[in-house]
């Protein structure tokens, strides 16, 4: 049983990042496809349900590829047909 049943999808609808970061029930996935507009499903069927209001997504910066350290990424999260957009963040290595 996955802990992400209430999330139906994560998409990169702004296409601002050529290397899409997808989050699945298998962990952080780097999809290298310039034309990727796919939906990543958490429950295996893209039919999330429930009414969870707080979702925490933690990304360990130390495990991101070096090329991702200076990439600006926009992520839209769809929760029960409601879209929530994260703020745009640029991460730079030190």
Curated annotation (Swiss-Prot):
Belongs to the UPF0512 family. It comes from the Eukaryota. This is UPF0512 protein S. It comes from Dictyostelium discoideum.
